[in-house]
């Protein structure tokens, strides 16, 4: 008998294929404080039991493969395997389940969202035994959170840098998103900031195209920024998009923004990737830059209810990887986002601790210990009539960003900015006086428009604009 054969025999190796549930379905398991916990929405193929489907997810996203291998005997499966420890049927669905999986912390590299996602949302999402699979939520243990830097600065440090308190911050994405020359782009930035906005923003599509190279844009926008600051006496910012084709080029652009004295840069964190984003977040903390995050490509991942990954998971991943702002939908604008679900992940971004709350789609209690919070950004199809609802929904610790709702003003960019600033201050004052923004919002805007011709003009041009379509991703409810 060869030594190799003896080794196989000594560990009781038996070739073949066995059901995943024999090893990876463990309903008696009690999750540990150090485990990463995942809630998967699993839709098995017809004839596949829920226990087998949940166990398959646990196996294929941790130590398992399709057949027994003799090298299993060279390690401790019980120490490293993922475990499906609980299964709940989804209300109103005949063949859909929420499967809870616990992963030992040793499966993941410290401080790496990239490695965490490679395992948990890797090849298992193409597994043939499943018709569809969606990651609904993660519980990140404190022991793992402490291996990440997190946001470069956080909410309080940003407010101190800007010297702005007691209200949401106001922003604007420069439009048209593509095609402007750097000089005309800088002009629009100046007009918006001069009119009263706190920030202007590069569109996520704007990197360094032939019509406007990044260095030219940075120079003209910096000039606009300083001119507006000098004339208003307020600290202003422009989100310089540092996203690039390589990490080296991305850092070079961030360095140039810092040399210009810019307070903030921007990154498209999903198209750019988590490794690039974490690298940029570390640079921003070391060099005093705020980091604005755009979520371009998120709907490819999170919009379908049965397959992919919910945005609350992407939001948690961003808080680990690092960002001071992130786009989070609007509830009332042109982009997808149900109110309760949106408020659920907004709290996950900002708060130190969130409890399980099925009414908002939160599957796990999550503690962030000392990790700084992230400002949610409401952006996409919003205008002055939305200001009361946005102020009431998102509160002070947010950025309200009006692109077309600023540059689409009939009198020009600066009057559009004035209209938004006046509307915001009216809503904040009314709220502080105890008025109900949800019920009295339209009245509050009309009252203030009597004293602001810019606001009155904006109210007139957008009075009929609504985006009333049903949300695709909604909370689970029993069918009647």
Curated annotation (Swiss-Prot):
Record-linked InterPro entries: RuBisCO (IPR033966), RuBisCo_large_chain_AS (IPR020878), RuBisCO_lsu_C (IPR000685), RuBisCO_lsu_C_sf (IPR036376), RuBisCO_lsu_fd_N (IPR017443), RuBisCO_lsu_N_sf (IPR036422), RuBisCO_lsuI (IPR020888)
Signal sequence region: none
EC number(s) reported in the record: 4.1.1.39
GO CC, one annotated term: chloroplast
N-acetylproline modification, residue list: 3
Pfam annotation, one family: RuBisCO_large_N
Function: RuBisCO catalyzes two reactions: the carboxylation of D-ribulose 1,5-bisphosphate, the primary event in carbon dioxide fixation, as well as the oxidative fragmentation of the pentose substrate in the photorespiration process. Both reactions occur simultaneously and in competition at the same active site.
Family the UniProt entry places it in: Belongs to the RuBisCO large chain family. Type I subfamily.
Further remarks about this protein from its record: The basic functional RuBisCO is composed of a large chain homodimer in a 'head-to-tail' conformation. In form I RuBisCO this homodimer is arranged in a barrel-like tetramer with the small subunits forming a tetrameric 'cap' on each end of the 'barrel'.
UniProt protein name: Ribulose bisphosphate carboxylase large chain
Provenance organism: Mirabilis jalapa
């Amino acid at each position: 008998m060869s030594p190799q054969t003896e080794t196989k025999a000594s560990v009781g190796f038996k070739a073949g294929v066995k059901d995943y549930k024999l090893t990876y379905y463990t309903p008696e398991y009690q999750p540990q404080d150090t485990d990463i916990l995942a809630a998967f929405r699993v839709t098995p193929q017809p004839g596949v039991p829920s226990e087998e489907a949940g166990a398959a997810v646990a196996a294929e996203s941790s130590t398992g493969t399709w057949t027994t291998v003799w090298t299993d005997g060279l390690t401790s499966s019980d120490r490293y395997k993922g475990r499906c420890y609980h299964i709940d049927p989804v209300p109103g669905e005949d063949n859909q389940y929420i499967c809870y999986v616990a992963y030992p912390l040793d499966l993941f590299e410290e401080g790496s969202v990239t490695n965490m996602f490679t395992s948990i949302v890797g090849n298992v999402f193409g597994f043939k035994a499943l018709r569809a699979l969606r990651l609904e939520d993660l519980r990140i243990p404190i022991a793992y959170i402490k291996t990440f830097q997190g946001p470069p600065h956080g909410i309080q440090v940003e407010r101190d840098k800007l010297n702005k308190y007691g209200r949401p911050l106001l922003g604007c994405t420069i439009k048209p998103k593509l095609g402007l020359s750097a000089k005309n782009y800088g002009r629009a930035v100046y007009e918006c900031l001069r009119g009263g906005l706190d920030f202007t923003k590069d569109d996520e599509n704007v990197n360094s195209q032939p019509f406007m190279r990044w260095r030219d844009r940075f120079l003209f926008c910096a000039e606009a920024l300083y001119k507006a600051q000098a004339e208003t006496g307020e600290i202003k910012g422009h989100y310089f998009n540092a996203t690039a084709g390589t990490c080296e080029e991305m850092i070079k652009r961030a360095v140039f923004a810092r040399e210009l004295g810019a307070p903030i840069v921007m990154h498209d964190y999903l198209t750019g990737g988590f490794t690039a984003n974490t690298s940029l977040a570390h640079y921003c903390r070391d060099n005093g830059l705020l980091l604005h995050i755009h979520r371009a490509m998120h709907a490819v991942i999170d919009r379908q209810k049965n397959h992919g990954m919910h945005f609350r998971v992407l939001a948690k991943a961003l808080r680990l990887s690092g960002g001071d702002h992130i786009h989070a939908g609007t509830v009332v604008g042109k982009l997808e986002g149900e109110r309760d679900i949106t408020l659920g992940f907004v709290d996950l971004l900002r708060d130190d601790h969130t409890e399980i709350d099925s009414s908002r789609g939160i599957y796990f209690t999550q503690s962030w210990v000392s990790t700084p919070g992230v400002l949610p950004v409401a952006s996409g199809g919003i205008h002055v009539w939305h200001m009361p609802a946005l102020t009431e929904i998102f509160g002070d610790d947010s950025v309200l960003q009006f692109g077309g709702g600023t540059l689409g003003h009939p009198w020009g960019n600066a009057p559009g900015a004035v209209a938004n600033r006046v509307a915001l201050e009216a809503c904040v004052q009314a709220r502080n006086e105890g008025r109900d923004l949800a019920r009295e919002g339209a009245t509050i805007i009309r009252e203030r428009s009597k004293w602001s011709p810019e606001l009155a003009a904006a109210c007139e041009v957008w009075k009929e604009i609504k985006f009333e379509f049903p949300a695709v991703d909604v909370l689970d409810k029993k069918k009647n």
